[in-house]
């Protein structure tokens, strides 16, 4: 499978539109790509036009709050990843799938961005750490306060999620009872 440039992607989408199909084994074989890739290209073009086909050099940044909002929307509405991606203007639906997986494994903390290089561990155990200045203590306290506020926000959102989840369950149970 070769990496597709923008011209090739547009050509594939144009041919798929001409044939009036989204999935095509003919196009997949012709361009040596998977059928799912053909479908993905057509869907991204329909949703975002040419912008959906352009490879970004830099990944877009999404805040943890936005990720949580999108994940909760996905879990509450049970829409497909593609539908949720269209609603929130996220080009790749697999991005949302990754967020949902992280949320299920680690909760809200799994949605935080770990950008950059991880901190180095002190290699020499005999080396003493530098003395901490008062200004650094203030910064550490401010950082700790910020982290605690984020935790409070997380627990509020989590409580809200479980309340909504509970109401959905009770609605579902009542509809099942009515059907019987």
Swiss-Prot record:
The keyword Zinc does not apply. The keyword Repressor does not apply. It comes from the Bacteria. It holds the Pfam family HTH_28. SUPFAM superfamilies: Homeodomain-like (SSF46689). Keywords: Transposable element. Belongs to the IS150/IS1296 orfA family. PANTHER family: INSERTION ELEMENT IS150 PROTEIN INSJ (PTHR33795:SF1). This is Insertion element IS1296 uncharacterized 21.4 kDa protein. It comes from Mycoplasma mycoides subsp. mycoides SC.
């Amino acid at each position: 499978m070769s990496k597709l440039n923008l011209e090739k992607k547009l050509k594939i989408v144009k041919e798929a539109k001409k044939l009036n199909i989204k999935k095509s084994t003919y196009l997949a074989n012709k361009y040596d790509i998977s059928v799912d890739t053909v479908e993905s290209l057509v869907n991204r073009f329909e949703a975002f036009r040419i912008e959906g086909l352009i490879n970004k050099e830099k990944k877009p940044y999404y805040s943890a709050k936005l990720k949580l909002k999108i994940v909760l929307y996905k879990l509450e509405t049970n829409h497909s990843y593609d539908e949720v991606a269209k609603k929130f203007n996220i080009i790749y639906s697999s991005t949302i799938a990754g967020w949902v997986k992280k949320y299920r494994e680690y909760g809200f903390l799994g949605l935080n961005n770990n950008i950059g290089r991880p901190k180095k561990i002190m290699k020499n155990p005999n080396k003493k750490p530098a003395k901490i200045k008062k200004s650094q203590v203030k910064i550490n306290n401010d950082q700790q306060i910020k982290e605690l506020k984020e935790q409070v926000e997380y627990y509020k959102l989590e409580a809200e999620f479980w309340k909504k989840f509970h109401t959905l369950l009770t609605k579902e149970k009542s509809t099942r009872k009515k059907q019987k």
